[in-house]
């Protein structure tokens, strides 16, 4: 996945979701829940699971789908 496509979703400041090749799905409710690594080769995604806060480092090469939610 190209960094520009993800950057556009972040700049729209609307919820979106990311799916990885491993089948993981990350819901991004707001731009504060996601950021790029320094070289824009990976994403850092913050998420809640069972009431606990977590983060995942997701290489852009493993992202198979990114789409805005309506």
For the regions a language model picked out, list residue spans one by one.
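Motif-centric detector for short Cys/His coordination patterns
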Residues: 1-70
